[in-house]
Amino acid sequence: MARAVGIDLGTTNSVVAVLEGGEPTVIANAEGSRTTPSVVAFSKSGEVLVGEVAKRQAVTNVDRTITSVKRHMGTDWKVSVDDKSYTAQEISARVLGKLKKDAESYLGEPVTDAVITVPAYFNDAERQATKDAGQIAGLNVLRIVNEPTAAALAYGLERGKEDELILVFDLGGGTFDVSLLEVGKDEDDFSTIQVRATNGDNRLGGDDWDQRIVDWLVSQVKNKDGVDLSKDKIALQRLREAAETAKKELSSATSTTISLQYLSMSENGPIHLDEKLTRAQFQQMTEDLLERTKTPFHNVIKDAGISLSAIDHVVLVGGSTRMPAVTDVVKELTGGKEPNKGVNPDEVVAVGAALQAGVIQGERKDVLLIDVTPLSLGIETKGGVMTKLIERNTAIPTKRSEVFSTAEDNQPSVLIQVFQGERDFASDNKALGTFELTGIAPAPRGMPQIEVTFDIDANGIVHVSAKDRGTGKEQSMTITGGSALPKDEIDRMIKEAEAHAAEDHKRREEAEVRNTAEQLVYSTEKLLTENAEKLPEDVASEVRAAVAELKTALEGTDIDAVKAKQEALATASQKIGQALYASAEQEQAAGNPGAAEADAEAAAGAGTPEGADDDVIDAEIVDEDEKK
């Protein structure tokens, strides 16, 4: 059976892990890091960069670098590069493709199956978009798992036999979740992890803390230099990077200095930024962001119907929880309970995803995971009211049916509008889509019986159907108002992703050919210069002409022309060796043995490009004097 990986697809960074011998291992990427920046860039030469290399060039390529795309999942957001538009799913697929490739390099085998995590508070459209991104990247998405649930799975399996309540406080780069889970083991060491309640804010994360520092720095420059940097894209990118660094430094230090030279230009010359930021200042400017974490926490405690004293463990997830102010607010909210420091907040979600992948694949048979739907699900009924069929925090998978009727006499069809959320009126909630049940037999209003069934699978993805009990006609939901991609669109994007991989391979091969050709030009020119006095003019002229032709080919884009001119130069260069050997023999005959041997031997290799060692024949040189 093929190996399945667990992927934490984050706003700022992503992580991939796998089970080895039943135990989870975080896989380092090609750059040697265990976390991969969720950054995608399109270079001006057309190359697609992903991860650390994309992040490093962001300042010089602002308009073609995409970050924090996770915040756009499940929306109609698109970005245009070189007259081609990309959806959030396509950009996320580039990140997933990079993680897939790194996992394949580590494991030495193809990887097709994956469990991908999402914030617990992701709605149906956001979950479906994540699944689509996995498909575009060439992955078979076994399961979509909530991030706090994955973290609790990684943490909870190491716990003892008693039932315990674990609170997971997950503050990532762009999203925030709080989940309460019950973890227990029986005598056979079989673990059951059940989510009791979950809540969150999909528009709150470390990016918002960074932005507050950026806004402060922009105002400082405006006050001191009279220049507004808010429209200067390159300056803003430098400020964003400096803000992220400052935020991290303030997690361990009480103050930091932000210094950026030549940030922009003013009437008085270049602008140099040099600002000191204390932890107290930082906490003051982000106080309202911290306040926003409290409501979801209180909602979870209320929904679960427990007291604070019932919480056994508090687990912090996401890099943003390293901020001291976040740790302090968690302690305050939980009545002074010290958060657990035994897990890596950046990696624990991917570890849990790998464990769940192992459970699905049958590698781990000692755990059962029971998740919940984070938001209530319902349809719009007369008066615009939201009639809920499935309440939030219902264990999934689940299926519920409800019978509705017509609002008018002889109504031939009903339009069923599906919503997700907690508000009393449908228009205030998230519209998932609409579908129509037609062919209803003529009857007075209130008489037809329309059975609407909601089915939420283990991924938290919604399926809806409606059936007229009178005629037996049935209609399943095809989302028309949501952001789910149609199958043909996904297929097209998959093909484009495969073509992109082939293009990368071709581009890499071309780069290798060019490097070899440039090396040949350099070594040949060096040889011509060093042996100018010993080479006949006709040989030197022929080789110089071949060098010039290869240089011209290298200036163009035709790689076949480069290969042809490279072969021509390699052939012409062999004449240098022949000429130098002839010169050496003449000098030996004139009584000066060995004087030109080094030059001749150097020339012998001049026409052989790097990597062509297969054509070299090893031979033993026999000293004629010894034989005598």
Curated annotation (Swiss-Prot):
Q: Which family does it belong to?
A: Belongs to the heat shock protein 70 family.
InterPro entries xref list: ATPase_NBD, Chaperone_DnaK, Heat_shock_70_CS, HSP70_C_sf, HSP70_peptide-bd_sf, Hsp_70_fam
User: What is the protein named?
Assistant: Chaperone protein DnaK
Origin species: Beutenbergia cavernae (strain ATCC BAA-8 / DSM 12333 / CCUG 43141 / JCM 11478 / NBRC 16432 / NCIMB 13614 / HKI 0122)
What SUPFAM superfamilies does the database record attribute to this sequence? Answer: Actin-like ATPase domain, Heat shock protein 70kD (HSP70), C-terminal subdomain, Heat shock protein 70kD (HSP70), peptide-binding domain
Q: What Gene3D superfamilies does this protein's entry cite?
A: 1.20.1270.10, 3.30.420.40, Actin, Chain A, domain 4, Substrate Binding Domain Of DNAk, Chain A, domain 1
Which stretches are tagged as biased composition: Acidic residues? Answer: 611-628
A single GO molecular function, which one? Answer: unfolded protein binding
Give the keywords, sorted: ATP-binding, Chaperone, Nucleotide-binding, Phosphoprotein, Stress response
**CDD domains assigned to the protein according to its UniProt record, in alphabetical order:** ASKHA_NBD_HSP70_DnaK-like
Q: Name one Pfam family in it.
A: HSP70
Q: Which domain of life is it from?
A: Bacteria
In which residue ranges is the amino acid composition biased (Low complexity)? 584-610
Q: Which residues, renumbered to this chain, carry the PTM Phosphothreonine? A: 175
Query: What is the induction note for this entry?
Result: By stress conditions e.g. heat shock.
Task: State the residue spans of region: Disordered.
Answer: 583-628
> What functional role does this protein have?
Acts as a chaperone.
